[in-house]
Amino acid sequence: MKSCILWLACSLALLTTVTAEDFTFKTSTAQLTLDDRGFCTSLRDTAGGAEWVIEKLGPFFTLRKNGVNFPVTRLARLGANWRAEFGAAGVTADLQISPQPDFIRIQLVRLSSPDIESLELARLALRPLKRNGSWLGALWDERFAVALLGLSDCVNVTTGGGRLTATVYREFGLEGQGVALIATPTANFLKQIRAVEHECGLPSPKIDGVEAKQSPDVRTDYFFSNLTEQNADETIHYAKLGGFRYLMTYDGTWARSLGSYPINTNNFPRGEESLKAVVDKCHAAGLKVGMHMLTSFVGKNDPLVRPIPDARLLKDDHATLAADLDAKVQEITATAPLTSFPTEGAFYGAAKAGFDLQIDDEIIQYRAIGGTGTNSFLRCIRGFAGTKAAPHKTGTPIHHLAERYGSYLVDLRTTLKNEVSERIAGIINRCGFDMIYFDGGECNSANGPSWYWVSQQQRDICERVRRPLLVQGSGGTPWTWHWFTRGCCDDFAAIAPKQYLDWHKIADSWQAYRNSFMPAELGWWGFLAWAPHQPATTPDEVEFYAVRMLALDSPVSLETNLKALQQNGRTQEMLRLLGDFEQLRLNGTVPASIRDKLAIGEWHRIDNTFRPVNYAVTRISAGGECAVTNAEAAQPLQFRLQCVPGLAPLGAATNRVLLPAAEPLNLLAPSTKAAMPGALAARIEFTKAVGDQFSVFMVGQPSPATSGETVGKPLDLQHHRALAVHLCVTNAPPVGAPPPVLNFQLEAGGKVYRDYYVNLDFVGERTIILPEPTTERMLPEFRPAPANYAFKAAMYGFNYRSVIALNLRWMRAGPANFVCTVKQVEALAELDAPLKQPTLELGSDKFTLPVDLGTEDYAEFRDSTDVRVFDKQGKLLQTIHPPNRVPQLPANTSRIKLDATGGGSAKLTLITLGEPLKYSP
């Protein structure tokens, strides 16, 4: 009996094998096989014979009808086309599947039913390929690449989970849509993409007759500043000094407002004539010019908003007025609960936010939501954004205006999109711009699915431009991949720029662009003047960037403004340094064997050598000493010595108490389910709301504020940037385990932060002074979970004059029984405490500086030159000859003592150099 069953099973298997039909589609580099069920049974590299699909793959085609997915059940020839049957759905799809030398084209010709919501034109489950080019729609490694390229912007290509999928939707059109499948050795990949672009009519822009992504311009830097007619000569000078080939001007510099983009006549007095004259002047100086815009944003000061808001502004929520409303009432009641309306301001991110309503032709800003049934807008500002307060009738629609970063948005389903496009493209064409940066493009996901809507304004503008254009922007999609020339690696960091470059810009952004075969530059990089929340940019930061540019052969974009350049006393020195490195990069002078080494660690260039360099920072008070470590050979002492503010003692009347001793907080270890790092342990709010037109802060609140709550005032900590925390720790972690880390995080208006980390590596009570943020630790050690806070918001600008909360966050958890009691937190008053005639003692040798350093002044001695003394803005105050005998810093550990007349404290940066790497110029 068993033998009969086995014989029958084998016979059925043989019958299946004999009767099944395979359909093969070949290109010059690959072979795709589908069986008569519509399953993909093979995707093979014809040269090497490697198989790239996973065995027992699911259906190649799937459609969605009435909310249910239906896989293909049969595939058969139908004349010149192919018919895919979806048996359970009772639907057929006729497709063209056309092999070409470089790709396979799959196009939907006809669907038998109009009720189809979506159709997967292709689905491939591939063997592991380590590179995910999600922007392009590709999976690849050094051997082989597979991609699905949508043949219009209506095709959604995804790359998640090792699967490539191309889907079309009824919302954007089904019949006529298509996709190109490329499968090829990686060395041929870009060539085959170009073939798809040319043969299928996809965007394939050129710069000076060369494919844009292969243009020499892709390797050049750009200088992003507030270029105006008045400062054009000075800006051109700075740009050429730094080796830049492009200048780009801010949207707020060339335009008076976003949306209708009137020319800013404060900066270009003769309007468009002045703007064109500046572009012409830059061209005459050998520089190309870029335009910055905020894509589809409409400023609240724009004619599209005031005095009568344009009906084509995007709305993202709706309610209905419950009662007649006069022109003065400040509480507005709707007919239903307002639980879907935002309770946070429109700051960082793409979530629905903002507090602006439109009723008829009036814009109204609410400050909170409450009332009986949570159906009232409270503390409303009537006639907001330059509109006129007016009465409104019961039943009138209440629209929530979509808002991002303090601006409204264009409804991209309306003709306003075309009007904005015509305005921008017209200025580019008439004035001769060579570049555009589509900033904030990702915010257009407020219109709907990001894969489609993010590209719409950019596409519409690019199609209207009649001159070569280098295109960059934020918010890429597989369709904008064809339009964009290269990518920018995110905004600049105001603090910890070195860590930000390595751990985010390169590790995240630059690598993501490279994975998608998109050229990339390492900007934006801030060139900064000193402010309470940020130090002035210094040459070692410039060199760090320049070395990475050289190592990766990637250009950079410098974001700054003329005021910052003028305030920073080391601007010319730093731009010359950058220009020298840029020339090295473009000339190909440094061999790849050395450039590969420069991609890791920190390096200092001296003549034709690169030497590993370490900048070790420690704080030291006059009369005290500190241990320093030199991991290299013995060498002359090199340093930067900066006078830091004195700090008031604990309990001083001038301090600001953030947590009083009478209200200690017992912090338990975070839940095992809590997102880490950055889980919130406690929050101390200094204000519930800030009287700013864009701002209501209810972070961490379970429900919106009500009209009965007290509106507080933010704290001014501009001169209280240091924190003193008194802690009691019980139940230390096991010996050898890393200590728990607690973040005393200041939060300012606009959901921006400054992080102060404390290692809880002790048991008992201790007071710890945190003189400044320790943000440099965040990305290497504690990148916060996105659910907790955006790490970039802790690295951007920060307003110490508007601190609204102290957040206590776990960056590293302790054991389950770990308890930390926070007994008091003070913000310490800063004191003006000069460092007079400082002397560094190293063994029996001394290095005396015959100078009085004012608060935040610094003395720098390196490369066996003179000692130079700078103020906090980098202005050169004095040059001092070093002593005849410069102290030698021995290898390994030694101790340095600081003496100064009258006391004071300093930040000592010890500079040590390793063995050189030499190259031939």
Name these PLM-found stretches.
Residues 25-247, 251, 269, 277, ...:
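Carbohydrate-recognition beta-sandwich/jelly-roll modules
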Residues 304-318, 405-419, 462-568:
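Glycan-recognition surfaces
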Residues 626-833:
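Beta-rich carbohydrate-recognition modules and glycan-binding surfaces
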Residues 275-299, 312-318, 548, 552-649:
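Carbohydrate-binding surfaces of carbohydrate-active enzymes
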Residues 221-318, 402-448, 452-455:
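Aromatic-lined carbohydrate-binding/catalytic grooves of carbohydrate-active enzymes
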Residues 339-344, 382-390, 394, 811-921:
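Intrinsically disordered, low-complexity segments enriched in serine, threonine, and glycine
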